[in-house]
Amino acid sequence: MKTIIAVTIFGILTCAYAAEGDDCSIEKAMGDFKPEEFFNGTWYLAHGPGVTSPAVCQKFTTSGSKGFTQIVEIGYNKFESNVKFQCNQVDNKNGEQYSFKCKSSDNTEFEADFTFISVSYDNFALVCRSITFTSQPKEDDYLVLERTKSDTDPDAKEIC
């Protein structure tokens, strides 16, 4: 009987915490993240919200005189309209979360925070991305990025 009660309580707690959704603020970033290697070249979205459609291309470049500042350019193709975003790094919270202020080609502004959980600089990255729009609640999602375009979306290279 004690086992049944314990399993039931565990199941209820599991469902309760799973229902809350993703929360990037509680994620632990990888300790040896090398931003100069990650923020270089092109990344493709392999798994995340909307991965089957639209195609998402992420280009990361570095610039700046002291250290470096990341500039993120994202091509986003949805409903046959191509929207581009440019994000400028504004902060590096606790050395773990990279914060950006972003503006789209259609003048939408938002803030994006990236927590890098696991990265193989030549192949893949597991990232927790938090986006905050001024008039909407914060949205946290886990993304799997890859260096080479997979065959899941043939249009991805065209928008990069």
Swiss-Prot record:
It is found in: Secreted. GO terms for molecular function: serine-type endopeptidase inhibitor activity; toxin activity. Expressed in salivary glands. Changing residue 50 to D: In clones TR28 and TR45. Residues 1-18 form the signal peptide. Keywords: Blood coagulation cascade inhibiting toxin, Disulfide bond, Hemostasis impairing toxin, Platelet aggregation inhibiting toxin, Protease inhibitor, Secreted, Serine protease inhibitor, Signal, Toxin, Vasoactive. The keyword Nucleotidyltransferase does not apply. It holds the Pfam family Triabin. Thrombin inhibitor. Forms a non-covalent complex with thrombin at a molar ratio of 1:1. Inhibits thrombin-induced platelet aggregation. Prolongs thrombin clotting time and activated partial thromboplastin time. It only minimally suppresses the amidolytic activity of thrombin. Inhibits thrombin-mediated fibrin formation in the host. Inhibits thrombin-induced endothelium-dependent relaxant and contractile responses in host blood vessels. Inhibits thrombin-induced mitogenesis in host vascular smooth muscle cells. Belongs to the calycin superfamily. Triabin family. This is Triabin. The lineage of its organism: Eukaryota, Metazoa, Ecdysozoa, Arthropoda, Hexapoda.
